[in-house]
């Protein structure tokens, strides 16, 4: 009977730890989500006030205002035909006329999903993507924001490194 009580207490303690980790990570996730939304809206405003050429230059800048979190978080710019116009870490994405049919390692056509979200004005998308500066692919949550009255949208996201750890 004592062993059974110890097992129950251990299980309760483990459950408590899991709840604590989830509780403590919620503000970090909220901050990360909020940062992505804020940066996308700032980029949209930059496009509207400074023009598309200046925005492409600034968004492509690895050390610019639209790259943060040690370079892991960044804004990218696309048009409604799924053509990448600016990306600070993957200039090779600028070459194709469209990325509409490109997929992640799991076969998800996430660029197509980006366009659908942009058609609605905004939205979140989840897919697998390489982490900048690392040789790993992790789940990424990206906020898509259509720049009002244009054929452009921007995106910014964060990676889920492991349960409760967002980057």
Positions of PLM-derived features:
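N-terminal membrane-sensor/transducer module of prokaryotic signaling receptors
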Residues: 2-9, 17, 29-167
